[in-house]
């Protein structure tokens, strides 16, 4: 197994490298009869694509998606859907200096240890460029779960957190940080600008919420909804931690405070919860509350400041990373986390239907 695929019934396989001619995904298990065209996918890729602001990498890619199979007369056929995105702005020469050197905190040494060779051009398969394929596949998944609304945003950048009391969903797509707090945007601009001037980078925290997830999706024990979400998010480049609901704060709480009390429902609902510390999942199964996931992303190690390392011969060297890179990879990770949420939920919907008939 090469582990380039994700999912059970709704499954996708990503392919391609950062500096190859193209990359893409093959989505398998999509139900037939759904209306699908490139126009359904492109808006999500546009949110992720590079070069959209001075706060992201200046690599310019249109990220224009092409549907190669699985769609006939505008509808899915139930057969594999192949999606392709061409790479058009590679500068492989920028990486010639690291062909024989290992960049600290990158996959260089680990890939060499596993495979005995590596594509050093932009990190090859380990590049965040691969996440474009996930976003494309996630756009297809959203069609399967049209009843669910998914919204991601940044809640922290460079150690600076948003003011939860100032949360405004309308602000999220009005700034380059996907930030719901207007006052935080100005602070984050300064943080990223200063990091770039200093030849450095900063980390971030992405929060993603899925609304209207039906109670019952998920499974106990070894296929829990929250474990599937955690695996999906931990597979994203630069993610070093995942929380569901209150996450680690739950360990600092008490049973009385952390329990999401239930009350008789209002009209049309089975139950009303008085809080959502669990993040919409208990015992691995959705409760019908919003599903809340947070991902911590490390600062990119692709910085212009010299870092101590070794070469393939084991000799001490200092590595300087050239090329064009994000000063904060967490910014463009927002649509990626959304995509992985969609892919997991589409899979869980089909699994729930297969198991229960509902």
Swiss-Prot record:
GO terms for molecular function: chorismate synthase activity; FMN binding. One of its GO terms (cellular component) is cytosol. InterPro entries: Chorismate_synth (IPR000453), Chorismate_synth_AroC_sf (IPR035904), Chorismate_synthase_CS (IPR020541). GO terms for biological process: amino acid biosynthetic process; aromatic amino acid family biosynthetic process; chorismate biosynthetic process. FMN binds at residues 125-127, 237-238, 283, 298-302, 324. Coiled coil: none annotated. This reaction introduces a second double bond into the aromatic ring system. PANTHER family: CHORISMATE SYNTHASE. Belongs to the chorismate synthase family. This is Chorismate synthase. The lineage of its organism: Bacteria, Pseudomonadati, Pseudomonadota, Alphaproteobacteria, Sphingomonadales. The gene is aroC.
């Amino acid at each position: 197994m090469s582990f380039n695929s994700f999912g059970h019934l709704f499954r996708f396989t990503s392919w391609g490298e950062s500096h190859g001619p193209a990359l893409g995904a093959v989505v398998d298990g999509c139900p037939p009869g759904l209306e699908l065209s490139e126009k359904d996918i492109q808006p999500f890729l546009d949110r992720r694509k590079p070069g959209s602001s001075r706060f992201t990498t200046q690599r310019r890619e249109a990220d224009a998606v092409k549907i190669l199979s699985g769609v006939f007369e505008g509808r899915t056929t139930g057969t594999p859907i192949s999606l392709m995105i061409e790479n058009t702005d590679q500068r492989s020469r920028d990486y010639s200096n690291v062909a024989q050197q290992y960049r600290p905190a990158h996959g260089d040494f680990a890939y060499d240890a596993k495979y005995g060779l590596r594509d050093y051009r932009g990190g090859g398969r380990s590049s965040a460029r691969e996440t474009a394929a996930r976003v494309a596949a996630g756009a297809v998944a959203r069609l399967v779960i049209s009843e669910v609304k998914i919204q991601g945003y940044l809640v922290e950048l460079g150690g600076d957190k948003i003011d939860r009391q100032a949360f405004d969903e309308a602000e999220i797509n009005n700034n380059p940080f996907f930030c719901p707090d207007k006052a935080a945007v100005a602070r984050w601009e300064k943080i990223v600008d200063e990091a770039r001037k200093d030849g450095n980078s900063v980390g971030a925290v992405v929060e993603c919420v899925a609304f209207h997830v039906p109670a019952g999706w998920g499974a106990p024990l070894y296929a829990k909804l929250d474990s599937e979400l955690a695996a999906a998010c931990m597979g994203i480049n630069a993610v070093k931690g995942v929380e569901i609901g209150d996450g680690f704060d739950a360990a600092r709480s008490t049973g009385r405070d952390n329990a999401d009390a239930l009350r008789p429902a209002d009209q049309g609902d089975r139950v009303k919860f008085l809080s959502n510390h669990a993040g919409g999942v208990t015992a691995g199964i959705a409760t019908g509350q919003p599903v809340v996931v947070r991902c911590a992303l490390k600062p990119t190690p692709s910085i212009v400041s010299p870092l101590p390392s070794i070469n393939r011969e084991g000799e001490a060297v200092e590595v300087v990373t050239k090329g064009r890179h994000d000063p904060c990879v967490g910014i463009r990770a927002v649509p990626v986390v959304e995509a992985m949420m969609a892919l997991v939920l589409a899979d869980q919907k089909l699994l729930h239907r297969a198991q229960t008939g509902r």
